[in-house]
Amino acid sequence: MQDSVMQRMWNSAHLSGGNAAYVEELYELYLHDPNAVPEEWRTYFEKLPAEAGTSTDVPHAPVRDQFVLLAKNQRRAQPVATSSVSTEHEKKQVEVLRLIQAYRTRGHQASQLDPLGLWQRTAPSDLSITHYGLTNADLDTPFRTGELYIGKEEATLREILQALQETYCRTIGAEFTHIVDSEQRNWFAQRLESVRGRPVYSKEAKSHLLERLSAAEGLEKYLGTKYPGTKRFGLEGGESLVPVVDEIIQRSGSYGTKEVVIGMAHRGRLNLLVNALGKNPRDLFDEFEGKHLVELGSGDVKYHQGFSSNVMTSGGEVHLAMAFNPSHLEIVSPVVEGSVRARQDRRVDATGEKVVPISIHGDSAFAGQGVVMETFQMSQIRGYKTGGTIHIVVNNQVGFTTSNPVDTRSTEYCTDPAKMIQAPVLHVNGDDPEAVLFVTQLAVDYRMQFKRDVVIDLVCYRRRGHNEADEPSGTQPLMYQKIAKQPTTRELYADALVKEGSLSQEEVQAKVDEYRTALDNGQHVLKSLVKEPNTELFVDWTPYLGHAWTARHDTSFELKTLQELNAKLLQIPEGFVVQRQVAKILEDRGRMGVGAMPINWGCAETLAYATLLKEGHPVRITGQDVGRGTFSHRHAALHNQKDASRYIPLQNLYEGQPKFELYDSFLSEEAVLAFEYGYATTTPNALVIWEASSGDFANGAQVVIDQFISSGETKWGALCGLTMLLPHGYEGQGPEHSSARLERYLQLCAEQNIQVCVPTTPAQVYHMLRRQVIRPLRKPLVALTPKSLLRHKSAISTLEDLALGSFHPVLPEVDSLDPKKVERLVLCSGKVYYDLLDKRHAEGREDIAIVRIEQLYPFPEEELAEVMAPYTNLKHVVWCQEEPMNQGAWYCSQHHMRRVASAHKKELFLQYAGREASAAPACGYASMHAEQQEKLLQDAFTV
């Protein structure tokens, strides 16, 4: 009898009974996907008889049905050891798939990113086929491509290798496999591999790309010729930045974006202002020539100035804003995020597609500045996220004079900090403009689809020194020998386009000549610039311009409505269970609202917010622990003890009310304060508050205070109504929890730049907060708020104080003293007032008056003189403070007080009562604190 097919297979070595389980597994795989098994097995399985016939073979239909059932139930027979059953080809197939993954993960380490060719990098061994047991003999062997997106399910190893090397090892180095989300990883693999990292662009796109490079290079050459040696921090060597920003703007516009906010440092800033934002070159030339363009204030150097304009895109008009920035690197990034969040809130842009942030960094600063990490940490936090930021690192491989990576970072790339939030990083050779264009398009598309940060690492070089007066070859001799021979990016790309026939040499030169002519004529050189922009895209600051400190304002509020708001704040959803102590606080506030109890600090502050919301002003409060308040006084957010849900009464006052935002911030001072500064500079009609958990910690954001809050208006004309609440007070808690460093803020005071207040009653803080918004003046407010006074029996106010009163820069004597008997006047601010008052009452003194200065800057000299006027028999005037002599208000404010005292009576001399000068803000021992406190109080009455 003729042997059946099955009999012959039984007789073969690899289909012995011991391999039956393996065959079953192959067949099950075949039933699930015929293409998933090797070709010879697929051919065999296809020829198996479907049902019993004349063949002597055992009928296979029932067996097949059984296998189908096995496949459906996902039961896997256990094969014997793989080594004994897997064919050599199958083993190699697995290794090929590992090779593909290795290129996705480490291909960037073999990519050609450095235009200068100075990077000395050894290609990873796991990108070699020999690492996987493959040889050149396997190059023409076909393998399944798995999830490799090259349009073929099967390809030779040679084809697979070529696709991988072209995709991942040319002038683009993509890092995306560190992303946890598989959808995002697959998205990048598909976008990169489907075009092998190099899409084909039209002649029009290539021509536009060359035009942008010609503009970038043309401006630098023009300025270098017209103003030789003048600092401009040029973009030479990194000209590809201009087409990057241009493409981000245009492509974002196609998604419906209405605003783009850009933050960057000095390098290339002037070039972007002219070539991306459309600043008139004539205005830039005036700045180079030192013409005084700022009517008031100190002004700032040209490469710190901000700018705004409108450009046209395929999706309509887009408003562009370049943020003002200081020389402190990277600090502008969180400012931009705050500005973007404010614009998104104004547009009710929940998805973040209407307003897009761009942050442009230097390589050394990106790796070195801690605020970079803080800003990244914001990216997905609900109080700060903006739908993803597009980061561009202008990686010119040198920071001033430092270029050796062993000196600039401990990571492989300068961009590695971005991996903390799983941001994809697209490294690209700046001398390959089409690769630059492609990664830019990828970055925009990724941001728009996944609403997350993305980083473009534009690897380039710096053709000149740190500035144009600097000679870099002294510290980077080899680098600058190479740069001297390096053609410009425009020259390289122009030659390539001419060679491929996309443009003629005449067309290339015409772009250069056209740009030069426009500069000579002082014309706008940005063709997409909108000459008559839509003003609805701008933030309207008109109502807040030109006001003096004396601008009239009324912070009173109708009593009945005030009581109604207080009652509304106490309404809690049914079934919502608050903590016992919180319930007692709310119960007390209910009594305060009907006049049965005096108003305390927490009640007055909350009512200030409620009344502003009622009058149409948004309120935003952030900081560590602001919902409850560091010292448990606010309780603006209530927490259900049953299910931990949160309820914010201030968000539920009435239908259609303005937005009330309350966010406990992450543990950052610098980035968070910078964010709120950016938010406040973009939302003039809102009360924007940052509260420090303790005022001592605000100096973690000193750069923001020095470079933006105190000086932004005089440098850039940038108005800002940000409020800083800084808990301050000496209660024996040691040097880290006593002082908000009042002296530092007062030292910064000049030209009526900020306001510094130290309120001591609930009514004062109520009217101070309302004044900050109701008065049309927009100046930062630094308020030193109390700790122990939050529950002090004497730090109280009445409903009438809130409804009918106003903020008083100077609070007069509270007791009914006979002015003629008063021989000593004690001036003070803050908590020490209540200690002085208690001491005077205890001693029964009627010859001492105590006056509080609640606003230390601008100093209220007229109000103080008015309060002092009745005391015609004064012999002593004393300033009393809790802080050491070298701290607090003494040194910065004494000249104001002396002037008022001498005007009152020429022989009066201002005396000091307070702690002795100290290197630390406060002592760490409770007993010593008590001794010092008693002495300064005694000095106030006797010195």
Swiss-Prot record:
Cofactor(s) named in the record: thiamine diphosphate
High-level lineage: Bacteria, Pseudomonadati, Pseudomonadota, Gammaproteobacteria, Pseudomonadales
InterPro entries (UniProt xref): 2-oxogl_dehyd_N, 2oxoglutarate_DH_E1, DH_E1, KGD_C_sf, ODO-1/KGD_C, THDP-binding, Transketolase-like_Pyr-bd
Catalytic reaction list: N(6)-[(R)-lipoyl]-L-lysyl-[protein] + 2-oxoglutarate + H(+) = N(6)-[(R)-S(8)-succinyldihydrolipoyl]-L-lysyl-[protein] + CO2
EC numbers for this chain: 1.2.4.2
Family the entry assigns: Belongs to the alpha-ketoglutarate dehydrogenase family.
Record bears the keyword Oxidoreductase: yes
Protein's name according to its UniProt entry: 2-oxoglutarate dehydrogenase E1 component
GO cellular component: cytosol; oxoglutarate dehydrogenase complex
Gene3D superfamilies: 3.40.50.12470, 3.40.50.970, Multifunctional 2-oxoglutarate metabolism enzyme, C-terminal domain, TPP helical domain
Transmembrane segments: none
Signal peptide feature range: none
